[in-house]
Amino acid sequence: MDRIGLGSNILREINPKLIYIAVSGFGTKGPMADLPAFDHVIQGLAGFTDLQSSDENPFDFIKTFICDKVTAYTVCQAATAALLARVTTKKGQHIDISMLHACLSFMWPDGMMHKTLKDDDRFNMSPGSDYFQIINYKDGGVAVAPLTDSHWEALLNMVGYPELIGTPLYASLASRMTNMDKVMEVLKSPRKDIGVDKAIEILVTADVPCSPCSSRDDLESSEQIKAIGALETYVTKAMGKLTVPTPPILFEGKETSQADASPLLGEHSRSILHELGWAQDTINELINSGELKITEI
């Protein structure tokens, strides 16, 4: 950005209240500082691909652009905090955020649970990744999050292992949390194929947190997703008919809607310059010279 005259020092000299956020892949120091970074690369370096390991794959991706999105959320948090600070200080600031640091911080609390406590005499947790196991039936999968003794009693009865109730491995939260890989093993092979609907009925009755595993093809027809208004469909000039999530933050007394697609490059160039008081002749000269991009819809 310095090369094109848009560096932090240059712009903040013009406007001391400017909040300038610089996002990098690996940070501004170290042997990888100047290397290109994309989501896949950060997933690998930050431990996400190890987190997703299985018996079949020692390393695997989380199959969504999670590192891009985590970094974006981190930038939003930083910008919001800096804006609030500026109310008091009347000053802007320069903020550096690396994808690697943001994603390592995101993954660490549960993904590195077993590496957080360094003293041998402290309570040693199982890796958080060991806590995830789907119960698979012929007609689909069930996601469960058993925590309490009563949850596990209901769950062990449901998957057909009542003889394990009260055994040392399952008897206490402490035992379960330190042996999570062994504890969750029974969910891989339920002794009866009772099906998803019956499993959900049993778990809900026992107050065990659970849900059926949705196919992505079924999300638009989900009654719960419809109930909270999480998706909307509208028509745009450029892209035609779209179905997208509505903004998930619900402010009191306000309807939430995406309302329209993101603008195309140059779609609002003319109107922005008009708003800034630029003469139409000057705008036309910039368009004709190729210096200003205009997209007419």
Name each model feature, range by range:
Residues 130-206, 210:
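Aromatic-enriched alpha-helical interface/lid elements that frame and gate functional surfaces
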Residues 281, 285-297:
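Amphipathic terminal alpha-helices
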Residues 103, 179, 218-222, 294:
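Beta-rich nucleic-acid/ligand-interaction surfaces
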Residues 9-11, 36, 225-231, 296-297:
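Short low-complexity, flexible loop/linker segments enriched in glycine and/or proline
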Residues 205-257:
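A glycine-rich dinucleotide-binding beta-alpha-beta segment and adjacent secondary-structure elements
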